[in-house]
Amino acid sequence: MALLAAGALAGCAATGKAPGAGPTTSVAPRATKSARPAAAAIPKPTPTPTLKPAPPPRPAALLVAPPSAAALPQTPTLPNTTDTAFKNLIHDFWLAVTTGNPDYAKPAFFPEKAYQQVKAISDPAYDWQTRLWDEFALDVKAVRPLVGRDARLLKVVVPGQYAIWVPPGACYNKIGYWHVPGARVVYERGGVTRSFGITSLISWRGDWYLVHLGAYSRNAPVGIVDDPQPGPGVPGPPGGC
């Protein structure tokens, strides 16, 4: 009996639940959802910049001679009207009158340092700045309404037969130079040919320079146009210095 009880107890121990243990529940593991791969970032297209049209190049004056030439001694060489120096003078002058900006003509205007060598007066630098250049600038602005911006230059007629050598002692000068009066600037505007004069060109070291455009002298600080005419006009007259 003792053995059977022991066996029975052993059987109960083998198959029975531990005292105090609650009912067991079998839970099947849940299937986990696999994470979706992150969508690849699509780069935004870079906007194409709007290209603005480049501004037209600004016009530029051209040199008649190196600036250093103004401080060198005068020469007796008679200038011509077919070389690059004269073509640059005309380029600068026409640019000045069609824009109304006299500064474009400064490389083509008789240099201040050369003027100081030429004139036998007390203060040639002051005279150049306050009379010679200022009057030329006024004359350029007076010509501007006649030609406008759209006029087309046809030719510049320089009466070489009137060119003279102005000797030292004449016209308050201490050294000489070549002078030619009454060149004609012939242009076309609106299909009509017109012209005006350049009162005086003078030389420095074999090149022509502008010096008086509208008049040699005036009674008031106003711009003057020299002999504006329909058609090509007539060069000259001779004289002056």
Please annotate each region the language model reported.
Residues 19-25, 169-241:
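Low-complexity, intrinsically disordered terminal/linker segments enriched in charged
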Residues 8-11:
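C-terminal motif of bacterial Sec signal peptides marking the signal peptidase cleavage site
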Residues 107-127:
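Short, solvent-exposed secondary-structure junction/capping segments
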Residues 123-194, 241:
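Surface-exposed, charged secondary-structure patches
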Residues 47-95, 99, 107, 117:
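Short, low-complexity N-terminal intrinsically disordered segments enriched in polar/charged residues
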Residues 13-16:
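Bacterial signal peptide processing site
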Residues 23-55:
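Extracellular mucin-like PTS domains
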Residues 1-3:
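N-terminal export and membrane-targeting signals
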